[in-house]
From Swiss-Prot:
Function: Catalyzes the condensation of carbamoyl phosphate and aspartate to form carbamoyl aspartate and inorganic phosphate, the committed step in the de novo pyrimidine nucleotide biosynthesis pathway.
Record keyword Phosphoprotein present: no
Recorded family membership: Belongs to the aspartate/ornithine carbamoyltransferase superfamily. ATCase family.
Sequence positions that bind L-aspartate: 86, 168, 229
Protein's name according to its UniProt entry: Aspartate carbamoyltransferase catalytic subunit
Origin superkingdom: Archaea
Pathway of action: Pyrimidine metabolism; UMP biosynthesis via de novo pathway; (S)-dihydroorotate from bicarbonate: step 2/3
Coiled-coil intervals: none
TM region(s), chain numbering: none
Binding site residues for carbamoyl phosphate: 57-58, 107, 135, 138, 268-269
Pfam hit, one: OTCace
Gene expressing this chain: pyrB
Subunit structure: Heterooligomer of catalytic and regulatory chains.
Major enzyme class: transferase
Length: 308
């Protein structure tokens, strides 16, 4: 497939071959970056970051990636600083911003907003998260992190813990892992189970899926534990949130039952679902995940711009 001009909206739009191209390109760029410190592939290109919803890691990671490729960045970090506050439609915002840029990265609270942006734009659009729907670039950096740590993805037992209902990171990750020979453990309160259609699709694709609310019953089986916060902002009813708040905390007591080789991941930000005492253990790789976002997003930007 020709990558130049391609949109990155959903992990569902990716074949396994596409994923492997991104991961191998990221690996190459990470090596080049360590050798040279600064690359020039995107010199003369401009990235527009349109963040209608708060972000620290994703926005700064994309901006860092573009700068490290030699490009420039424009954009806004919250909708209140844009003309959307004056009533401008998303479509008009996109059509305007594309006049100033070569690629757009968008985060929006409404599901489907990134797809709409891609439909109206004539330049590539990358989804940095649309509501509780998809977060494809987070998924790619998660896969990259797993592969770097284990040298493979196939054959692993991977647990997804926490808010599996509203968590867009785990929706995208579960769908991508269906391309690999893995066993998935879905660990959540009953109220926050993975959407049924995703579980059914995983099983139809031959993935072995276990569902439980009891972390301790499976912690000893896992190679990877992917932890998510319970996302208060996604709940339609605060009472529903209060019922599940603080359902899990990964701490040293929990990890004492785990394999020595278990790796704990988290898309961040965290609240209290991973105790800070875990940070200094050999299990914790969530800050490595943060770094890995840079080469992965460099790869995506370079590919859709057609410069690498």
């Amino acid at each position: 497939m020709d990558w130049k001009g391609r949109d990155v909206i959903s992990i569902r739009d990716f074949s396994k071959e596409d994923i492997e191209i991104v991961l191998s390109t990221a690996e190459r760029l990470e090596k080049e970056l360590k050798e040279k410190g600064q690359l020039e592939y995107a010199r003369g290109k401009i990235l527009a970051t349109l963040f209608f919803e708060p972000s620290t890691r994703t926005r700064l990671s994309f901006e860092s990636a573009m700068h490290r490729l030699g490009g420039a960045v424009i954009g806004f970090a919250e909708a209140s600083t844009s003309s959307v506050k004056k009533g401008e439609s998303l479509a008009d915002t996109i059509k305007t911003v594309e006049q100033y840029s070569d690629v757009i990265v968008i985060r929006h609270p409404k599901e489907g907003a990134a797809r709409l942006a891609a439909e109206v734009a004539e330049i590539p659009v990358i989804n940095a998260g649309d509501g509780s729907n998809q977060h494809p670039t987070q998924t790619l950096l998660d896969l990259y992190t797993i592969r770097k740590e284990f040298g493979k993805i196939d054959g692993l037992k991977i647990g997804l813990l926490g808010d599996l209902k509203y968590g867009r990171t785990v929706h995208s990750l579960a769908e991508a892992l269906a391309y690999y020979d893995v066993e998935l453990y879905l660990i959540s309160p009953e109220l926050l189970r993975m959407p049924r259609h995703i579980v059914e699709e995983l099983r139809e694709k031959g993935v072995t899926v276990y569902e439980t609310s009891d972390l301790m019953s499976v912690i000893g089986e896992l190679d990877v534990l992917y932890v998510t916060r319970i996302q208060k902002e996604r709940f339609p009813d605060e009472q529903e949130y209060l019922k599940v708040r603080g359902s899990y905390q990964v701490n040293l007591q929990v990890l004492s039952k785990a394999k020595e080789t278990l790796k704990v991941m988290h898309p961040l930000p965290r609240v209290d679902e991973i105790h800070p005492e875990v940070d200094k253990t050999k299990h914790a790789i969530y800050f490595k995940q943060v770094f890995n976002g840079i080469p992965v997003r460099m790869a995506l930007l370079g590919l859709v711009l057609g410069v690498i």
